[in-house]
Amino acid sequence: MSSLSKEAVLVHEALVARGLETPMRAPVQEIDNETRKRLITGHMTEIMQLLNLDLSDDSLMETPHRIAKMYVDEIFSGLDYSRFPKITVIENKMKVDEMVTVRDITLTSTCEHHFVTIDGKATVAYIPKDSVIGLSKINRIVQFFAQRPQVQERLTQQILIALQTLLGTNNVAVSIDAVHYCVKARGIRDATSATTTTSLGGLFKSSQNTRQEFLRAVRHHD
């Protein structure tokens, strides 16, 4: 991973050490993204033909390529650490020692069990130590880890570990509330339920007052 940013390497190594990295096999050989898209296009063509879809129809003929491009460049782009967001961290010269919260971060992910949509919002908080992070970078970190096949529990913890690693503090909290289309659109077909996951570190875990302050922020939009 020598071609990656220092921040990307640190985050990846922290997740691996904790057993929280997305399950990925070591590639037999490195292939570029254009080759990857070409190969996926071929496999999607076979899948659609097995479904008896007519790929000569002008509405369907480009679908395999569209899906391949979507997978590699968009909804699974977070599998590629070369796309890890550029992180701006500055010295905490202001001596901020109270909770900083970013609420209602929109995220769209993909259930790794059925490859259908997870649609939700995240709330992220941290108590600065020596560094503070550009607020938009929190949104970008959430979106990076959402752009993978995911389970919500792991996604929540990945965001937590990434921010703890980059900020040099355990005092981070993450909550995600999401609708899973593997529940909504198939199986039980429950269109109204949502899933909430929370991951707490440092004072958010050990201090009841800090934890309650965060949970009040999570509920603020209700």
From Swiss-Prot:
Keywords noted in UniProt: GTP-binding, Hydrolase, Metal-binding, Nucleotide-binding, One-carbon metabolism, Zinc
Ligand binding (Zn(2+)): 111, 114, 182
GO cellular component, one term: cytoplasm
Molecular-function annotations in GO: GTP binding; GTP cyclohydrolase I activity; zinc ion binding
Catalytic reactions of this protein: GTP + H2O = 7,8-dihydroneopterin 3'-triphosphate + formate + H(+)
Pathway: Cofactor biosynthesis; 7,8-dihydroneopterin triphosphate biosynthesis; 7,8-dihydroneopterin triphosphate from GTP: step 1/1
GO annotation terms (biological process): one-carbon metabolic process; tetrahydrobiopterin biosynthetic process; tetrahydrofolate biosynthetic process
PROSITE patterns: GTP_CYCLOHYDROL_1_1, GTP_CYCLOHYDROL_1_2
Record-listed E.C. numbers: 3.5.4.16
PANTHER family: GTP CYCLOHYDROLASE 1 (PTHR11109:SF7), GTP CYCLOHYDROLASE I (PTHR11109)
Family: Belongs to the GTP cyclohydrolase I family.
Oligomer and partners: Toroid-shaped homodecamer, composed of two pentamers of five dimers.
Record-given protein name: GTP cyclohydrolase 1
Organism: Klebsiella pneumoniae subsp. pneumoniae (strain ATCC 700721 / MGH 78578)
Gene assigned in the entry: folE
